[in-house]
Every structure is written in structure tokens, then in C-alpha cells.
Amino acid sequence: MPDSVLAVRLRDLVDAGVFVRVPYESAPPREEYRLTKAGLDLWRILIAIWAWEMRWVERPDVLPPLVHLDCGKKTSPVLACGGCGEEVGARDVVPEVGPGGSLYLTAPPRFRRRSSKDSEPTDPQLLYPQTMAILGDRWSGVVLTLAFMGVRRFVDFESAAGASPTVVSDRLRKLTDVGVLRRGDGGEYRMTEKGLGFFPVLALVVDWAERWMGSAGEPALRLIHEGCDGELAPVWRCDRCGAVLERRRVEFRLDPLRKGV
């Protein structure tokens, strides 16, 4: 990555509250980047991305296993409701637009224009290319969220997203190509099993955004767990011992042959 591009990305992450610059040398003055509390809390989303790619994406390489240090076993974590403890998936929740949100979603403005071609996840060095195809583009994430909320028809995607027909058509095509949406005979778009499997990522992104960027007491989107009729507070549970996972008690185990590469 060119230094100029890296500098822009680091600045954006600082502005978003994910990184903070900390001086570590005074002569000459130098700074290092450290994760904030909001940045550290992204670990739950990263595990969701890892788990989805492990389950649904054919890869030329093998992702490292996740180990739960408390039980010492490799885990395939399970998303659960923090209120009742039950396992939860896309079919177990009802999305509701909160007082701080609207179905007429609009993506935040971009300060630097980037073409659709430039945003294609074609770089073989990308660790999670299909996830980047969904989350790496602002409109793709909006369209997939709307599909999860029950939007089916093209005109409804266009109206709810507040995007141009060209943008909506392009993102629907990309999401269909990735395999998270399918287009039926009647022209409606529905989520595939692969798309429904992306629910933990969406749920944790919503939870993180409300926790660190939302207005106090005014959620933009609420996820109601039908099992307990409460608002979903997603947590990860170890599928081996059942305990709730904590950031400092899990780690990825790299292949010894790949260390230092």
C-alpha cells in the first residue's frame, strides 16, 4: 500500500474514533497509533467475519483456527442473545426501525470519489474478499441491510436507500454475484442461506455502531429477539464449553510454518 493511501486510511480511522495517535518520542516528535476502546470492541465483528468466511467462502488458503483459552479448545463460536442466553440467527429476530433511524436510509457522504471498478475486491492479498464486497462499499451494506429488513422489490430498494437506480442495480447485481441475494422469477430479491448466514456480522455492526456512534436513547435500528421478546444484545458463546467469549480469552493460532512470513 502506498504511503499516501495508508496515511489517508489511518486519518479516517482516527476521525472515526477507532485509532488514537500517541506520542512515543519527542526528539524528533513521533507518534504511534493505538486502538481506542471503540476500536478494541471491533473484535466481535472480526470474529463474525472470520466465522462467515470459514462457513461460506471457498478459499485458496486456510484461515487460522480460533482458540478459547479458558477451555483450551478450538471453537466455532455461536451467536447468542445476551438477555436469555439462547442461540440466535436471522430467523429468530424481528428488525424494527428505532426513533433514531428511518427506512429511508442514506449512506454518509464520501469525501473522496471512488469508482465502482476501484471498489471491486480483486486483490488476491485481501484476507476476506467476499466480506469486503459487502462491507467495503457503503451502498452494498445498505442494500443488504434493507433486504434483511424485508425489502424485496427494486423500486423499494431505490426508495428506502435514497440511491439512484444505477447504484441500486449495480449493488443488487454484486450481491447476487456474491451469492447472498437471489432474484426470483417475479423480479423480487430475497436473501439466500449464505446471505442469512451473514446475520451475525450485520447484528454486531449495528450493535457496535449504536454503542459507539449512536445517539443516547435513540437507536436507529432495533433487533428484537423473538425467543425472549427483548432487544438483542449479541454475545459470542464457545461451542465447546458454552461460556461467553471475552476479547482477552480468545486468540487465533497461526500455522507455525507461516509465522514470520
Question: Can you annotate each of these PLM segments?
Answer:
Residues M1-P2, L126-A163:
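N-terminal helix-turn-helix DNA-binding core of bacterial DNA-binding proteins
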Residues M1-V14, G162-T176:
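Short amphipathic alpha-helical interaction segments
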Residues R21, R183:
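Short beta-strand "wing" residues that participate in macromolecule-binding interfaces
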Residues D41-R59, G197, V201-S215, A220:
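Short, solvent-exposed amphipathic helices
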Residues M54-S119, G214-V261:
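C-terminal regulatory/oligomerization modules of transcriptional regulators
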